């Protein structure tokens, strides 16, 4: 028989150790059961039985065909090539620079004379026959009126009532509705009547340098058999003398055949309406100089000198008999004065005292200057008045009164004639109290991004002693006021679909035209 191995007898220490282990296991089991009943531990998942475990079949092996060896990968650096990202980056940069240069070239000022026939835009060609002889001429609530027939009826002053009835009686030009009279390509920034009294001849400058010309004496070419809405739109000539916004226009009374236009492209051009040539009247010495012009004016007594302001706060004086591109040492014809640290939005000379000038600035001031004693180093104004917000424009009339518009929603009128303007001695100054406005008209001037800034414009030679000016109304009207702040008329019509923000008077006739952001024209006569 095989010999069996006897189990050795445990010592007292080992017996005690085994008892301790058993006691510990029992305690752990008890604690685990109590924790599970209290929800602290989840029950261990049940182990799958061996019968439920199935072995997945091994995938079938597919015999691979012999393939040609793949070339070994090499980096672009080892192959002597630039990384693709660098090539793409360089290509994108080159394309960007090319586009930037093309855009800059498109907006760059064109020097020299321009033949009008070469800058005509669109199908309507330039026709100078209708312009011959001009050189011999001496928050807005839509359609909600703030002035109307009831106001006229309540007028007690006989002369004022007659004038209100006369101005309110102006009628919208009938042959075409405003939405069919698109005079330029983009938003209108400036407008002007030709001084001729024989017919309403209207000029409009837009945001991109187009100049539109409308002869409002034309009539629709309509046959009797045609339906009323089938006759063609009015004939409008559009040319492009500038490469940027036409901000201001002027015709000197001694030479009505020339139209001067100032632009954000830093130049002033003189368009000869009879010779059909647009000559460069002023431009900076270098074509790379960027000096956007905000306004132009001329003294009635001097047809040779141009005055202009810039968006950089400068005021310039240019004698057209000398080239503006001459070197300073050769007797340059241009003199600059920095009148403001910020943009000058508009300015005007006093027609009867042209050595006095008014400027309106983004620095919230309207200032009056004496050009006879204007220093290039430290120019000092005759007087100034500060508004709570920026002042957009300052317009002088023939009597020495100034009308301004401001973003504080007001039109302010300053009567310098009553303060002895024509008798002022050189170096005369006005105190703060003397520069206070004589009349303040509440007027919505919050034009926003898509409406041209509202500017008052006086009638140069009215047919009565009452001075008057017109200004666009955000409710889609054109308002007419006197120099004392009394409203004469509110011109409008249901067919006007945009704000006629740019509004101007004819020099002598009671004709008013308004231009909109959609380049449409509203004409009252």
UniProtKB/Swiss-Prot annotation:
Gene3D superfamilies: YVTN repeat-like/Quinoprotein amine dehydrogenase. GO terms for cellular component: nucleus. One of its GO terms (biological process) is DNA damage response. Pfam families: WD40 (PF00400). It comes from the Eukaryota. Residues 53-62 have a biased composition (Basic residues). InterPro entries: WD40/YVTN_repeat-like_dom_sf, WD40_repeat_CS, WD40_repeat_dom_sf, WD40_rpt, WD_repeat_DNA-damage-binding. Disulfide bonds: none annotated. One of its GO terms (molecular function) is DNA binding. The keyword Chloroplast does not apply. Belongs to the WD repeat DDB2/WDR76 family. DNA-binding protein that binds to both single- and double-stranded DNA. Binds preferentially to UV-damaged DNA. May be involved in DNA-metabolic processes. This is DNA damage-binding protein CMR1.
